[in-house]
């Protein structure tokens, strides 16, 4: 009976410690570089131009020089990233600061209705975005 009691106590102690150490480990992992925009899912018409204002936030104690990219967009969806009037492919952010850049996405006139997903990346940081095209597009514009 003493052996059974000791095993039960050991099991109780181990089960009590494991969840706390697991939770603590997850909470201690900081997100060092973050991309942010409040407009993560929007609805537009074919032919629209979308202008995103995106913050690159550096929560580290070191300078971050991040490569910027957009993935997941078809070649018919033209896009450009700018800040200060310059086209960007890389952006430097001082420690504990943020920099804002603009992403312009042109929705083609000939596009099917539906939801389109793409990702903006800055180094390892990723910002998933979603554009919903509410109506079927055509080649013609209305005048």
Regions found by a protein language model. Give the residues of each.
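Bacterial N-terminal signal peptides that target proteins for export
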Residues: 1-9
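Intrinsically disordered low-complexity regions specifically enriched for long asparagine
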Residues: 6-7, 20, 108
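Bacterial N-terminal signal peptides
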Residues: 10-18
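Long beta-sheet-rich domains in secretory-pathway and surface-associated proteins
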Residues: 24-143
């Amino acid at each position: 009976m003493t052996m059974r009691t000791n095993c039960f106590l050991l099991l109780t102690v181990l089960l009590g410690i494991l969840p706390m150490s697991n939770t603590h480990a997850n909470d201690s992992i900081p997100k060092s570089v973050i991309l942010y925009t409040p407009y993560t899912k929007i609805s537009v018409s074919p032919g629209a131009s979308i202008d995103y204002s995106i913050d690159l936030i550096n929560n580290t104690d070191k300078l971050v020089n991040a490569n910027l990219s957009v993935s997941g967009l078809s070649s018919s969806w033209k896009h450009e990233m700018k800040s200060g009037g310059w086209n960007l492919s890389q952006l430097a952010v001082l420690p504990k600061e943020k920099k804002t850049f603009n992403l312009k996405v042109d929705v083609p006139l000939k596009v099917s209705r539906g939801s389109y997903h793409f990702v903006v990346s800055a180094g390892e940081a990723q910002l998933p975005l979603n554009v919903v095209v509410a109506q079927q597009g055509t080649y013609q514009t209305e005048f």
